[in-house]
Amino acid sequence: MTHTSSSTSSAFGPSTVTITNCGARRAFPSHARRVFVNDSNMVAMMLSIGAGDQIVAATGIKGQTDALAKVYGHRAVSALPDSDGSYPTLEQVLGARPDVMLAGYGYGYGESTHLTPEELRARGISAYVLSESCRAKSDDKARGVMDPWTALRSDLSNLGAVTGHTQEARKVVKDIDTRRRALARAPQASTKPTVLMVDSGDTGSVFTSGRYGGPEVIIKAAGAVSATTDVANTWTTISWEKIAQTRPDVIVFNDYPGQTKAQKVALLEANPATKNLPAVKNRRFVNIAYPAWTSSPLNVDAAETLRQSLEKYRMVPASGIKPRHDVTARG
């Protein structure tokens, strides 16, 4: 990732940095002090690089503070200015007077609420878009234009430059890469198990993640194959009938308010399309916290946790890999 610093005066003040975000070169403050962050995965990015005290508002983190505290500590998480449990409005963002807004399409930005990068830029606020949520075309609602690990590395590098924590960001990226290499060196199954991510669902469809979402690379890093690897999107809805064709060996749940693990299991066991799937019949389920599934530094913790679970279910050989952090959830 190439960053270009400038000491010339601009709308951002005397010091700016030019970064590439969603394929576009844009100027940002090089030492942003007031960052409005939406969603727990992006809060995790900021905390991981030591920029927590530069968060002026944090929204959309209701129900995820315990998961964040397990990794970043209760003191750091309790100090977050939790403005609201819900996603922000344009008025709320403007009222916080941020230098930078950190959000994504489907993660706070949306045309229906008029909270868009374009609207913020028109009002003098630098708008950063979560790379996982980048759109291939401005009028295309499908998200995802790059490999999820590449998206995460890009965001950490960019946010390091914008907040003045470049070295810290490099250390986080290096640590993730080291742990990924350890997972890649682990012994593999002769036939890799198929894993399905279930965020939520009803009798007709499941909200899940395609090949541009974090679960794709998490599942792959753990030594398995994603049941939705052929879906060209990040987070999206597909039919249970399509899922049933993949015959998943293990089902992983995204622990997220609105539908408990028990409710998801009951749905799977009652649905004719899923009740006889290997994962359901053998009750091979793994429940992991939301910030570890969505694009964040915790993705590697999710991969280590899933690897351990696959070994427990005898889906892959023993490796000796242990999760560094506990990102499981009771549900």
Where are these regions (language model features)?
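Bacterial Sec-exported substrate-binding components of ABC uptake systems
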Residues: 1-45, 158-198, 313-331
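Short helix-initiation/N-cap motifs at beta->coil->alpha
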Residues: 21-23, 79-90, 111, 231-239
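A short, structured surface patch at a secondary-structure boundary
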Residues: 39, 43-96, 100-101, 105-109, ...
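Solvent-exposed loop/turn segments at secondary-structure junctions
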Residues: 41-44, 61-64, 100-101, 106-110, ...
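Extracytoplasmic ligand-binding site segments that recognize negatively charged/polar headgroups
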Residues: 64-66, 107-115, 125-158, 191-214
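Proline-aspartate-enriched helix->loop->beta-strand connector
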Residues: 89-103, 240-256
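Structured C-terminal subdomain patch of bacterial secreted/periplasmic proteins
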Residues: 146-156, 230-231, 252-331
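Alpha-helical, coiled-coil/dimerization segments enriched in small aliphatic residues
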Residues: 208-235
